[in-house]
Amino acid sequence: MGDLSCWTKVPGFTLTGELQYLKQVDDILRYGVRKRDRTGIGTLSLFGMQARYNLRNEFPLLTTKRVFWRAVVEELLWFIRGSTDSKELAAKDIHIWDIYGSSKFLNRNGFHKRHTGDLGPIYGFQWRHFGAEYKDCQSNYLQQGIDQLQTVIDTIKTNPESRRMIISSWNPKDIPLMVLPPCHTLCQFYVANGELSCQVYQRSGDMGLGVPFNIAGYALLTYIVAHVTGLKTGDLIHTMGDAHIYLNHIDALKVQLARSPKPFPCLKIIRNVTDINDFKWDDFQLDGYNPHPPLKMEMAL
């Protein structure tokens, strides 16, 4: 993990930057509790972990392995659109949700009448239409339910001191209709000194595959919301409940731990976008991303 003395310390946090993630992985490997899980693979698990990532002059896209940046962007824009159709991502050559929208997975989980690609009322639906009755991924839900994302944006603009700027993906009524319950369940925004910060609570964190993606995804959401509200970016605080390593990811993560992190890249939004619904892939410029090679880890199903 390199020389820790070269990293700036933050009050309450021993390490900063990517070393926080690497330390979490190392702690789970050393002290994690062996647990069974729904996939049958098994995990090493610790409960309650937190890291703080500085978003002011850098973007927390891990460098000790290559993270699929375009997928991070396209998935977030898909959430923002309120979409729950995995075929929309597949059409952009993003296949991270394909297996969950497959007829085999849907049938195995009791969704026999679902069209292929229909994931149920997952993240995007909850962000934009919380409380609306979910029919299918093709229905028009315009002005149905609560648009939590737009409500947060409006509140940041009109009442930035508010402590109620929250987006929740955890809707107990809708969970039986989802292909998977949300792993990252809630985020809260905070404005101070002209900066926007975000804290995300993740009930379940797959350290090998999901967590690097989730860190980048919520960092990007913070950049986007800051852009449309005229603020600078502050911090991303990433809090996890069950932080775990699948047993079949251990070898790859040991390779990752042996690598020294490189400087995080910088992110620029290169077009003046005022409506959060108008962002597209070409609006984001990532500079200085020079990661170590990718590491293959199988998705646990």
From Swiss-Prot:
Q: Gene3D superfamilies annotated for this entry?
A: Thymidylate synthase/dCMP hydroxymethylase domain
Going by the record, the broad EC class of this enzyme is transferase
Q: Where does (6R)-5,10-methylene-5,6,7,8-tetrahydrofolate bind?
A: D206, A300
Which pathway is this protein assigned to?
Answer: Pyrimidine metabolism; dTTP biosynthesis
Q: What is its EC number?
A: 2.1.1.45
InterPro entries per the UniProt record, alphabetical: Thymidate_synth/dCMP_Mease (IPR045097), Thymidate_synth/dCMP_Mease_dom (IPR023451), Thymidate_synth/dCMP_Mease_sf (IPR036926), Thymidylate_synthase (IPR000398), Thymidylate_synthase_AS (IPR020940)
Where dUMP is bound, by residue? R38, R163, R164, R203, S204, G205, D206, N214, H244, I245, Y246
PANTHER family for the chain:
THYMIDYLATE SYNTHASE, THYMIDYLATE SYNTHASE 1
Per the record, the similarity remark reads: Belongs to the thymidylate synthase family.
Query: Which function does this protein serve?
Result: Catalyzes the reductive methylation of deoxyuridylate to thymidylate.
Record-given protein name? Thymidylate synthase
Name the source organism: Varicella-zoster virus (strain Oka vaccine)
**Lineage of the species this protein comes from:** Viruses, Duplodnaviria, Heunggongvirae, Peploviricota, Herviviricetes
